[in-house]
UniProtKB/Swiss-Prot annotation:
Protein name listed in UniProt: Exodeoxyribonuclease 7 small subunit
Family, as annotated: Belongs to the XseB family.
Quaternary structure note: Heterooligomer composed of large and small subunits.
Keywords: Cytoplasm, Exonuclease, Hydrolase, Nuclease
Organism: Chlamydia felis (strain Fe/C-56) (Chlamydophila felis)
GO biological-process terms attached to the record: DNA catabolic process
Entries under PANTHER family matching the protein: EXODEOXYRIBONUCLEASE 7 SMALL SUBUNIT (PTHR34137:SF1)
GO cellular component term of the entry, any: exodeoxyribonuclease VII complex
InterPro entries: Exonuc_VII_S, Exonuc_VII_ssu_sf
């Protein structure tokens, strides 16, 4: 399931919430849906962490470049 795009995972999570809120959804179905939702949430959380790490890395790199350029101009 790790291959699913983030947006698709979020869309499926919304579908699961809708299904679980239906009175006609059985307990067994709700449990299966909950398990699927748990797996999807883990995937989404992992993708968000990776994106945050990448943004932090790019920001640090940009800041290092700016500091280096400022030092060059100061000399």
């Amino acid at each position: 399931m790790e291959e699913i795009p983030f947006e698709n995972a979020m869309e499926r999570l919304e579908e699961i919430v809708d299904l679980m809120n239906q009175p006609s959804t059985s307990l067994d179905s709700s449990l299966k849906l909950y398990e699927e939702a748990d797996a999807l949430m883990r995937i989404c959380e992992s993708r968000i962490r990776k994106a945050e790490d990448r943004v932090r890395e790019l920001s640090e790199r940009r800041n290092e470049t700016l500091l280096s350029e400022e030092e060059s101009f100061a000399h």
